[in-house]
């Protein structure tokens, strides 16, 4: 955590601390403080890093029990470093929603990270550089640690969507209800299919999906009854987003029956 403690004291860390994630779903008249109160640490750009660090530790602990040959001790160390550093460059390029981020956006973020690394962290960069190249900016999709970290990030998105779903079910955040529905719809459209695929080789992912099975199923059912949620997208995207959600829902139903 020393890496994070040093970074959060920089101007870059302070910039992240003042920003929220999932901003596109937040009603404009709702404060950042209220948004964080509802959805927790994942919503603040800086504390998202330590939350992801915690998710990485959870994955590592579960893998040590269920899949002890999956990760070496060095793998475990690099995953935790990657969690703490992966969004540092967003202090410069900003946060882009998962479904909107393009390959060009990824390249710009990587370039900003590399150009400013010495300012982000003044210390030994050996582990940071290794995590950066092998995990954070691994674009091959074939590297084991890159896949594990991608799965951890996707679990983070789903976790926050399920927290939003809790507020929908309880009806205790009506000032944000439409935005929470949209957040849940967007995440359910994008994350479950990939996580189902990861569950075939990464047992901690399979356990997470099993533990959250009923809640995920309920949120799919709620969004399936809320067709107007897709009106939040630009008109030229709405039909594609409906289809994407439908395909994801179908994949989840098939997974439930497997």
Please identify what each model-predicted range represents:
Residues 1-258:
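Alpha-helical, largely C-terminal catalytic domains
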């Amino acid at each position: 955590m020393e890496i994070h403690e040093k970074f959060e004291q920089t101007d870059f860390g302070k910039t992240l601390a003042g920003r929220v994630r999932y901003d596109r779903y937040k009603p404009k008249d709702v404060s950042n403080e209220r948004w964080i109160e509802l959805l927790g640490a994942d919503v603040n750009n800086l504390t998202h890093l330590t939350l992801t660090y915690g998710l990485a530790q959870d994955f590592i602990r579960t893998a040590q029990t269920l899949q002890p040959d999956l990760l070496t001790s060095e793998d475990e160390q690099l995953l935790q470093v990657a969690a703490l550093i992966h969004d540092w460059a967003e202090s410069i390029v900003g946060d882009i929603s998962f479904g909107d981020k393009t390959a060009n956006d990824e390249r710009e973020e990587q370039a900003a990270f590399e150009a400013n690394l010495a300012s982000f962290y003044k210390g030994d960069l050996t582990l940071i550089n290794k995590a950066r190249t092998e995990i954070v900016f691994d674009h091959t999709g074939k590297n084991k640690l890159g896949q594990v970290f991608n799965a951890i990030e996707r679990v983070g998105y789903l976790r926050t969507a399920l927290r939003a779903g809790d507020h929908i079910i309880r009806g205790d955040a009506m000032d944000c209800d439409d935005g929470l529905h949209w957040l849940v719809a967007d995440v359910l459209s994008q994350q479950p299919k990939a996580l189902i695929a990861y569950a075939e080789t990464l047992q901690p992912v399979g356990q997470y999906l099993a533990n959250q099975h009923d809640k995920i199923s309920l949120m799919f059912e709620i969004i399936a009854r809320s067709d107007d949620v897709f009106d939040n997208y630009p008109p030229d995207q709405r039909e594609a987003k409906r289809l994407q959600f439908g395909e994801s829902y179908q994949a989840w139903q098939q997974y439930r029956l497997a």
